[in-house]
Regions:
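Generic hydrophobic alpha-helical membrane-span motif
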Residues: 136, 183-184, 250-252, 276, ...
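Flexible, membrane-associating and regulatory peripheral segments of lipid-active enzymes
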Residues: 1-186
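Serine-dependent carboxylesterase/thioesterase catalytic core
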Residues: 4-20, 177, 204, 220-324, ...
Length: 430
């Protein structure tokens, strides 16, 4: 490819038959096209992982070629080539090297999840600017290569332990979502987690309650779903893993709706068991007219998206400190169910984007730490409570803990985190 990139200069410097030169250039052009579009991924890899590896390889070759080409340009300046020939050679080299890099970028864009959208925007406006584009190409290469190694390691790990079925629990797993979301088929609330559990032997089902409503209403829907799963699987009970308000819904169903005889374990993830005091503060300051306006718009939107009778305000009010205190007083834990809770926290306002970064600031006066929505004190519930300790400045947000952004976070593998939870359930006979 370097030969093709420097064809204008080599045409003048190499004294051979013109027809032979033309033939060589055609062959070099064909080779370059094949190289750009051929799969270069690791043997044994497949699908997006292979495309990601291939894209990183092609982009890496392009970046390396750009460095070598810079040296070649300097050397050519000391030859007998005239200015026009040097300019033509430089333009040819620039075009071929850029096409090579863009070929890698396209493959990465088709398969990578860890490349930031902002990078694509910057690339769109700077791909033709020398040096700047090289800096961006390098960023893409490092991100793609890092993601490839991480994902391939996950696949290798799953393959090595596949026969052990470490997540094959006695009872099926029921994953109950939090407020303002639904269990859509296209966009999974739990990100990459369910597939990871299934690959390791778990039987996974979803709560399918509405996006927002009173705890008592959502709990009724969760209770119906528990009965459906038991009827479908023939299992005696289910293991519930619930995030955010889903934990309150599940506790209500267990204690008030007779689901304790059908639930073996309840694991709550970042659930506001003792409420969100900043919600009390906001509701006390926002005029009722604005609250009503937001409620109507939200309910209309989510009715169109599949909810039967959503209620934004009812759901929000049941997250207040006052309502959660009343819920706790009237909802004792069942002796038939094994409870455990998990909580995380953000370490700075930069740990997450909007609206969790705003929630982080609003929550600061009410506890020693929070995840952007729930304080640590509110999320740790019962005797079997665990705090996720994350090294570094980032921390783990309310969204990170359910893989909302599908991001590979350094020192926190969210998929393996859930594998460990379910693995422990299996080891304990659940």
């Amino acid at each position: 490819m370097l030969l093709l990139a420097n064809a204008p200069a080599l045409w003048k410097l190499i004294d051979i038959n013109s027809l032979l030169k033309t033939l060589i250039i055609i062959l070099l052009a064909l080779y370059t096209l094949v190289f750009m579009f051929k799969s270069h991924g690791r043997k044994g890899s497949h699908g997006k992982i292979r495309r990601l590896d291939s894209g990183a390889f092609v982009l890496g070759c392009g970046v390396l070629q750009s460095v070598i080409q810079l040296i070649i340009v300097i050397v050519l300046c000391f030859t007998k080539l005239n200015g026009w020939r040097l300019l033509a050679n430089a333009l040819c080299a620039y075009a071929i090297t850029t096409l090579l890099c863009l070929s890698g970028i396209v493959r990465i864009a088709a398969s990578a999840r860890q490349v930031k959208i902002l990078w694509y925007v910057i690339m769109l406006f700077t791909w033709y600017i020398p040096i700047v584009n090289c800096i961006m190409f390098r960023k893409f290469y490092k991100a793609a290569r890092s993601e490839y190694y991480f994902e391939q390691a996950k696949l290798d790990l799953d393959a090595a332990r596949k026969e052990n079925e470490i997540c094959k629990t006695k009872y099926p797993i029921l994953m109950v979502h939090g407020i303002f979301f639904r269990d859509w088929q296209v966009i999974n609330y739990w990100g990459r987690v369910p597939n990871e559990l299934i690959r390791n032997g778990a039987e996974v089902y979803y709560g399918k309650q509405q996006s927002a409503n009173k705890v008592s209403v959502s709990a009724t829907e969760v209770a119906e779903r528990i009965k459906e799963v038991i009827a479908e699987t023939g299992a005696e009970k289910v293991n519930i893993i619930a995030h955010s308000k889903g934990g309150l819904d599940s506790r209500y169903a267990i204690s008030h709706l007779g689901m304790d005889k059908y639930v073996a374990t309840l694991t709550t993830i970042n659930t506001p068991h003792y409420g969100c005091k900043f919600v009390d503060m906001l509701l006390g300051k926002i005029p009722e007219s604005i609250q009503g306006f937001v409620d109507r718009k939200y309910n209309k939107l989510f009715t169109a998206l599949g909810d039967k009778d959503p209620s934004f305000l009812d759901g929000v009010y049941d997250l207040t400190y006052k309502n959660c205190s009343e819920l706790n007083a009237s909802t004792p834990d069942s002796q038939l169910v094994s409870y455990r809770s998990v909580m995380s926290k953000m370490n700075s306002i930069r740990s997450a984007g909007f609206p969790l970064n705003i929630g982080y600031l609003l929550n600061k006066p009410y506890g020693k730490g929070n995840d952007g929505l729930v304080t640590v004190e509110s999320g740790l519930y019962g005797e079997n409570a665990k705090m996720i300790e994350h090294k570094g400045k980032r921390g783990i947000s309310h969204g990170d803990v359910i893989d909302l952004f599908r991001e590979n976070i350094k020192d926190f593998d969210v998929r393996e985190f859930y594998v460990d939870i379910v693995k422990e359930l299996k080891e304990q006979g659940f």
